[in-house]
Amino acid sequence: MNAEFQGRDILLQQLSKAKIIYKQEYAFISIKFKIEGDIEPYPYHVRVPVEMRAFQQSSAPIIFLLHIVNGIIDELEIITADSAEINTDNIEVERVEYEINQEVIVKNNS
């Protein structure tokens, strides 16, 4: 996670203790996380704290949505903006854009 937002380090800790359940269908990929062991819950009541769009040269952007449920990292949902089939072998991540939920934006105190 290259984007900076409040609680990011908590989610990274949760990811380090997660088992991954991968599911792919035509136009989406679901990466579910099952957390094992004790973890610090994400303290913000935001379902999707960060979204990433990866712009592709020959197709619509691919959108990555990180879902949090009850303070626990739950799923990384990956979809195409035009509902086309996702080719996991050719996802380009050279040009990405992040959208941070307003509730968890890191505010500068300058």
Residue ranges and their predicted role:
Residues 33-86:
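Amphipathic protein-protein interaction modules
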Residues 1-47, 88-110:
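N-terminal domain-onset segments
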